[in-house]
Amino acid sequence: MKKAWWKEAVVYQIYPRSFKDSNGDGIGDIQGIRTKLSYIKELGADVIWICPLYDSPNADNGYDIRDYQNILSEFGTMEDFDELLGDIHDLDMKLIMDLVVNHTSDEHPWFIESRSSIHSEKRDWYIWKDGKNGKTPNNWESIFGGPAWEYDQKTSQYYLHLFDKKQPDLNWENEKVRNAVYDMINWWLDKGIDGFRVDAITHIKKKEGFPDMPNPKGLDYVPSFPYHMNADGIMDLLTELKENTFSRYPIMTVGEANGVAAKEAADWAGEKNGIFSMIFQFEHLGLWDVEINESIDIVAFKRILTDWQDSLEGIGWNALFMENHDQPRSVSVWGDDGVYLKESAKALSAVYFLMKGTPFIYQGQELGMTNVAFPSIEDYDDVALKRLYETKTAKGTSHEDVMKIVWKKGRDNSRTPMQWNAGPYAGFSEAKPWIGINENYKWLNAEAQKNDKTSVYHFYKSLIKLRQTYDVFINGTYELILPEDQQIFAYLRKNESHTALIAANLTGTPALFRHSGLPLSSDALVLSNIETEPHKHMTSVLLKPYEARIYLWC
């Protein structure tokens, strides 16, 4: 396979509203990011991905864009952005931005003109339909709950919004829409950014005719993913997108590819004809949709991640992640954010970080930041969470039971302010932040962990150093071992010069690792999260709860 700078990179994701406030208004901003670039550089990351900075009314925290070529005033100005981009490049790092083109804000000039009249020149820039029998055009449910259609009194038609009603879907069947989007993308790339993470891109193609979903349960609105997620014909749109934008620049692109199966991976992220440099697949995150007190199926976890490794071996590239701004904190879901917080955060990091692909670290993940449990739904900001709460309680679910779901799976778990130190407001701001801070910030923070060589932060630094030092962790092959073990996730990475073993117990009870073909010795142990006893030529070792070991042989 060809070499590419993004294959060797480690990406650090920033959610700007919660990263660092520079002007005391309780909201993170661009100048705040500039003050923390040295922190990211010292960690060892080489690429920064920043969630939307564009002008937005913030119905969905920036994913409802009002102006693609302007900066939200809360975050700063375009001049601030240009300074940030220059700083990042001066540090020999790169910057990728979120690209949100399935939908815009309903306050975008395109939509304002579109809704002004049935005869507007931009009417078909969005998806407008007449109602059916006094109801919505079809029975599709929005991803955020409720109908996927909103009635507009001025023109007596409905517009489609797969997400919030303030996020109308663009009509990608319209060539003028596509060309306007391409012009905007190229404007940013000409400015000098280094790529995009492409949001919700699997939803741009809708099933022809917009038919009703089958509805055997007689629901008011039916989850409609089969008719708008990775739908037939989407590759034609994506191929044109790539040809008119991405392929013209030496950039990194990451597609948010919800609904894409491992067997389709080459079409999306294949080196020969794939659309993107890599994609985020979400199959393993489906394992989080379990009962609140149910443990994760480790065998299924291994199988899913291995399927993706195998599907792209020799033909494409994986994006490796456990957290982002839309997911809960991994240590609170996959690990143990109580007694074994430090150990489990490190074990999880070792497992995902050293697979074949480009690893992503979400802000605070390198500290083992945890989920938060605010008592009231009013303490939360996320529009999807609030819709969930309204829907569940309206159907009779108790406040307590709904909050258990919020505490485990809510998106705001990862959106609380970055915990920089033990000072007021966790060093994030000098004023009360836009959302509450996790109360554990007084002991779980960046300053404390930088001063503790046994911290999660320093373990991440060590993982990054390993990856930078040994090519086997970048280009080596991947081989799962012990696939049916219900506690241990173990795999090999191999190239012509090295073999590496990554083995981690992902449970709170001891687990016996046994493999006769891998004699384990202390002199080959390059990293572990728990101090080990001297050992030589062992064919089995007892791994303590959440113990992880990385061995390397020449």
From Swiss-Prot:
Main localization of the protein described in the UniProt heading: cytoplasm
GO process annotations (BP): oligosaccharide catabolic process
Subcellular location: Cytoplasm
GO cellular component term of the entry, any: cytoplasm
One GO MF term attached to the UniProt entry: alpha-amylase activity
Class of enzymatic activity (EC top level): hydrolase
Catalytic activity: Hydrolysis of (1->6)-alpha-D-glucosidic linkages in some oligosaccharides produced from starch and glycogen by alpha-amylase, and in isomaltose
Site (described: Transition state stabilizer): 326
Stored SUPFAM superfamilies: (Trans)glycosidases (SSF51445), Glycosyl hydrolase domain (SSF51011)
Hydrolase found in the keyword field: yes
EC nos: 3.2.1.10
InterPro entries: Glyco_hydro_13_cat_dom, Glyco_hydro_b, Glycoside_hydrolase_SF, Malt_amylase-like_C, O16G_dom_2
Protein family per UniProt: Belongs to the glycosyl hydrolase 13 family.
Name this protein carries in UniProt: Probable oligo-1,6-glucosidase 3
Organism expressing this protein natively: Bacillus subtilis (strain 168)
Gene: yugT
